[in-house]
Amino acid sequence: MAKAEKTAAVAEIVEEFRGSTAAVLTEYRGLTVSQLTELRRALGEGTRYSVVKNTLTKIAAEQAGVTGLDDLFVGPTAVAFVSGDPVEAAKGLRDFARANPALVLKGGFVEGKPMTADEIRKLADLESREVLLAKLAGAMKGTLAGAVGLFAAPLSQVARLAEALREQREGQSAGVAEQPAAEAAAE
C-alpha cells in the first residue's frame, strides 16, 4: 500500500471514529464472506462494519482522540462503527457471536469511554434508549399523578371543613334568631 493510500485510509478511519457514538473491535478469523455479509445486515443501517489494518486504525484512533484501545489491535481486526444506538449494535454483535463463535468481541468505546468485551456484553443486555426513555416517562407520569393527588387532597379537605363550618354557623344564627322570637311570644 502506497503512502498516499495509507494517509487516505487513516483519514477515512479518523472520520469514522469522530462520526461514531461507539466503536466495537472484533476478531473475525474463521468467518466466511457470507457470514460477514450476514453480520453487516444484522447490525443494521446505523452501523458500519469494516475489516481494518491494525497499524492504520491505531494511528487513526490516536488522531481522533480515542484512547484505551491500543491493546486491542492484535490479530485480524474488524471495527463496527456505530452512529446510531450503541445498545442495538452491541445486541447485534452479541447475538451474532453466540451463533458464530468465530466472531470474538475484543472491546471498544462508547461515547468516548473505553469498554472491555464484558462491558459491551452487559451493554447488550440493556434495553434500547427509546424503551428506557418510555419507562422513565411512564414513571414520571405516575409520580406526577400521585403528587397531584397528594396536593389536591388537603385542598378538598379544607373546602369540606369550610362548608361544614358555614353550615354550623348558619345553624347557630338560625337558633339565635329563634330565641328572641320565642322570648317575645312568652311575654
From Swiss-Prot:
- Pfam families given in the database record: Ribosomal_L10 (PF00466)
Organism superkingdom: Bacteria
Q: Which UniProt keywords apply?
A: Ribonucleoprotein, Ribosomal protein, RNA-binding, rRNA-binding
Q: Which InterPro entries match?
A: Ribosomal_uL10, Ribosomal_uL10-like_sf, Ribosomal_uL10_bac, Ribosomal_uL10_bac_type, Ribosomal_uL10_CS_bac
Which SUPFAM superfamilies does the UniProt entry name for this protein?
A: Ribosomal protein L10-like
PANTHER family in the cross-refs: 39S RIBOSOMAL PROTEIN L10, MITOCHONDRIAL (PTHR11560)
Q: What does this protein do?
A: Forms part of the ribosomal stalk, playing a central role in the interaction of the ribosome with GTP-bound translation factors.
Q: Name one GO cellular component term.
A: large ribosomal subunit
Q: Which GO terms describe its molecular function?
A: large ribosomal subunit rRNA binding; structural constituent of ribosome
Q: Which CDD domains match?
A: Ribosomal_L10
Name the source organism: Frankia casuarinae (strain DSM 45818 / CECT 9043 / HFP020203 / CcI3)
Q: Which family does it belong to?
A: Belongs to the universal ribosomal protein uL10 family.
What is the designated name of this protein? Answer: Large ribosomal subunit protein uL10
A single GO BP annotation from the record? translation
Quaternary structure, from the entry: Part of the ribosomal stalk of the 50S ribosomal subunit. The N-terminus interacts with L11 and the large rRNA to form the base of the stalk. The C-terminus forms an elongated spine to which L12 dimers bind in a sequential fashion forming a multimeric L10(L12)X complex.
